[in-house]
Amino acid sequence: MPSPRCNPLTVSVPELFFSRSFSSRSKIAKASALPLTMIAALFSFYAVANACAQAKPNDKANSSGTQKAHIQTIEETTVDIPMGEKEAPLRLNLSQLMQAYNVPGLSMAVIDHYQIIWAKAYGTIGTGSKTPVTTKTLFQAGSISKPVAATAALALVQKGTLSLDEDVNQKLKTWKVPENEFTKDEKVTLRRLMSHTAGLTVHGFPGYDVDAPLPTLVQVLNGEKPANTAPIRVDFVPGSQERYSGGGVTIEQLMMMDVTGKAFPDLLRESVLQKIGMADSGYEQPLPAARAALTATGTYADGKPVQGRWHIYPEMAAAGLWTTPTDLAKFAIEIAQSRNGKSNKVLSQKTVEEMLTPVRPKEGAALGFFVEEQNPGQFGHDGADEGFQALLTMNWQTGNGAAIMANSDNGVAVADIVMRGVAKEYGWNYKFGGPLSPLLLIAKLRGVQAALDYFTQLKKTGVSEDVMGERSLNELGYRLLYGGRQQDGVTVFRQNVKLYPQSSNVYDSLGEAYANTGEKELAIENYEKSLQMNPKNDNAKERLKKLREPK
């Protein structure tokens, strides 16, 4: 039991079984209360403050006694997972969570009533490093690059240089969107690029090793070597649906460069970063040596560092921003205050109102940001580059928000828990969505069989598929498969096939696992099974083609 002086933080079971919903890329699962039998028995997942073991911050926040108490409570938050009547529960504080998830460093900034009330950093810049992360340490923002880039594009719209609803080919000079049957009646527009409704391919970008040849932007758009992604093309009618596309944002980048004649980092620095006071941020790819010395090292899920410390992203608008949580918080505050008509450093109130309006109602994608129907006023984005993950959320109505960045492919797993702690401590009226599962944490600390046993016992309580089901095991399998535990990944995927034999996807995943472990015939067998159940599974077709190629 915590010492009474700690003011222990407690997050309820339903809240922790449902993660943040400002993540943009999947349908939001509806949160519902868990069975009382589950709450009363073994299988809750909640957070409490632990007075005896806390993560030690690397930066001291200037704050009042009350604020320091809030910070201490969040820092002392512990994940507590009861495992059963005969087994000791799992209890971890923030630093232990970071260690369990192979997160070397984490940095965060908290916003209350439109002000950054504190910013702190934890851990080190890389696995095995003794250099601490500070609030000035630079992290890759991943897809949070997109709303910052969208702000620059909207500034050009305000000037009349660009139009939201004009065919982008009218402004593009160095490259054009190839016309096809899908663009006959509906065109690719800037509004559709920013809202992922333009019908464009290529979800995201893996980046390039620091010593690899870099493609031009046109080579990226055409999928020409040395680009490492497919051609960016329209493959459904623009405006007819929403599908996340970093490829579309790359067209947005080229269009801004074409109409201004400026290098993208210069354009963003002049039009957005300097005006908001984001002095530690930039889109330079690769970074100049002086700024490179200020960065964290990207880290894979298994704790190994990214070769060369990070990847380079010529797709700057989609994935190229280097920044800090404090700078991201400044950005979020400016957007919120512009929406309230209290600031116009970059965009007017009218423009930001349009920026935060979903293009396709109910689907969430606005112009650069994602917004949440269940949380009025909330906007945000998450991000992931090779070895880095980040979260940004803000509410323009309440003035509350936070930015969290980590140098790990598991960063969001820890950031989710921290974000809920912040929301609880500061009394945010925030409805979480999308299932959060403790399975990976259990697998890491108690073994994969313990995680599968936990899953089985939890299902016996009648918990819904949204909370714990096929998707939960599939995610666990991939986390293990690409986190240095391939055989454990195979074990999880085999269990998923056993439990959900009518799903074509479970066979596809098991096929991928076998391919990774070098069991070619088993990989072919499972891909064939998946394709038999779902003839439209293009992934299985492509994988089978590669597996059957003569060496």
Q: Model-found features: residue ranges?
A:
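Short active-site loop at a secondary-structure junction
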Residues: 99-107, 128-192, 233-247, 316-319, ...
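Helix-start (N-cap) detector for alpha-helical repeat units in TPR-like alpha-solenoids
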Residues: 147, 470, 504-505, 538-539
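Short, surface-exposed loop or secondary-structure junction motifs
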Residues: 122-126, 180-386
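Short, gly/Ser/Thr-rich active-site loops of penicillin-recognizing serine hydrolases
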Residues: 374-375, 408-473, 483
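Short, conserved catalytic-motif segment at the N-terminal edge
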Residues: 81-139, 177, 227-232, 304-306
